[in-house]
Structure formats: structure tokens, C-alpha cells
Amino acid sequence: MRLRIPRLLARWAAITVSISALLFFAAGTTHVSSLRSYLAVFSSLLLATMLTVDPDLAKERAHPEDTGVDDGLRFAARLLFLLTLTFAALSVGRLRHTFNVPTHARDGGLVAFAFSGALQAWAMVVNPFFSPTLRIQAERGHRVIADGPYRFIRHPGYLAMSISVLASTLAIGSWIALIPAGAFVLVIRRRAQLEGEFLRNSLSGYIAYARKVRGSYAG
């Protein structure tokens, strides 16, 4: 535990600094209130999630086993996420398009972003197998999870990610960033569909769970 906390804080700081540097560089300034507010919420959600997630899951997510099943979609999703943030920061900074998004919409976007972060954290806390790769974690006793948000919808993590990226564009104040954000949502939905098919074929009890919980972000 003594070693875990310093490493966790170092990783949190590295991610926060990296994302902040990306946004402020794209904006060309640090004097954009919507960016500062967004980064404050982003950093807080990230730290809260990292502190509450299961240590074994944190290790799995930090060093996932490479299965090659969906590498293309994972890469595309990460790229589109970064493009969305870059476009948004560029729009409100160097291009000065902040006025295109009303204040109440930016505030609503920030609230939606915080909600998505809470939903994502909830899913990760109740699901110790929340891995970024498609694989059955037999070495950790992989089983179907039907608690928390999984009682209401399959793939709540993907729903949270989609809300998060769409809300980020509004919270920062950019309409144009909805273009890469929309592409991100399409990629994530396809990824959720692939995961659903994979789990139906590979995880014992998942078919029965899918029959019981009809709601699915994968469609």
C-alpha cells in the first residue's frame, strides 16, 4: 500500500499534466476559464477513480494482455479522444469560437462530464474485470457482473465514455469538436458490439445475463 499510493499519485500527476499541456498548447493560452474548469473536474474524477478502483484491476488496466482482437478500434478511440480535446481547445483558444456555445450549455456539459465520470468509476468499482482488452481473465476467476450499473444496462462503461467525450466538447465550449466526438461514439459503439459478441461466445453465464438485462449500449 505504501508503494501503491506514491505510484498512483505519480501516474495521476503525469496524466493530468499531459492532458493540461495538450489543451493549453492547442488553445495557445492558459487564460480560458472553460478549459481550467474542465481540467479541474477531469483531474478530480481521475484521482477519485484511481483511489477507489481495485488494485488488481488497476494493474490489469495499466498492463493489459495484448490479444490483438480489437487493437484497431482501441487505437482509433484513443486518437479520436485526443483529437476531440485538441479541436475543442483550438476552437476556444486560437480560433476564439467560445461564443458559439452558450454559458448554460457549457455548464450543462460540465455537469454531464462529471456524471459520466461517476458512472465510469461506479462500473469500474463493481466490475473487477473492467479491462481495456477483450479477453477472459481466467487467472482472476472472470465471471459475469450483474451489480451496480450492470443491473440496468450492459456495457455501462462504454455509455459513460460516449457521454464523457460528447460532454467534453460542450464543457470546453466548442461545437466543431462534436465532429471527432461523434466519430468516437461510433467507434465505441462498434467496440461494445464486438465485446458483447465475444462475451456471449466466451463467458459462462453471459447469455443468461443478456436475456435478463435487456438494456444494452451496444444496441
Sequence positions of predicted segments:
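Membrane-anchoring alpha-helices and their flanking helix-loop junctions
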Residues: M1-Y150, L159-G219
